[in-house]
Amino acid sequence: MKAAIHQNHGLLTCSRHSIEAAAFWFIALERCCQQQLMIDATGVAPKLVPPDKARFSREHVGSEYIGWLHFQPIWGQLVATQPDMFD
């Protein structure tokens, strides 16, 4: 398990290998939640992803390495735009 949604508390993510991966999973889950709220606001029934396609996506995009890798541009942007972060 990489993430949990706690009622009245918010999101929690984790990683076995790196803080970067946990941070990326948090950002990705936050974006998913935002998308879900926008879909719900339309009043249209969402089109669900078939289980086999969801499983394929998890197996190819859900690895710890991919989480770490996808956080690298975010980290680069933070370092470039917030240099005082290290003071």
Task: Kindly label every feature range from the protein language model.
Residues K2-D87:
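A conserved C-terminal secondary-structure "cap"
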